[in-house]
Curated annotation (Swiss-Prot):
InterPro entries: Crust_neurhormone_H. Pfam families: Crust_neuro_H. This is Neuropeptide H. Residues 17-36 are annotated as: Disordered. Keywords: Hormone, Neuropeptide. GO terms for molecular function: hormone activity.
Length: 36
């Protein structure tokens, strides 16, 4: 399920990158799923 979650997160990040107008959302996603 980790792989599935990662794929979903990657898709979300890609979408945010396309319309990088909500850094807050990106910050929340990073906090919820720290890649570090």
């Amino acid at each position: 399920r980790s792989a599935d979650g990662f794929g979903r997160m990657e898709s979300l990040l890609t979408s945010l990158r396309g319309s990088a107008e909500s850094p807050a959302a990106l910050g929340e996603a990073s906090a919820a799923h720290p890649l570090e």
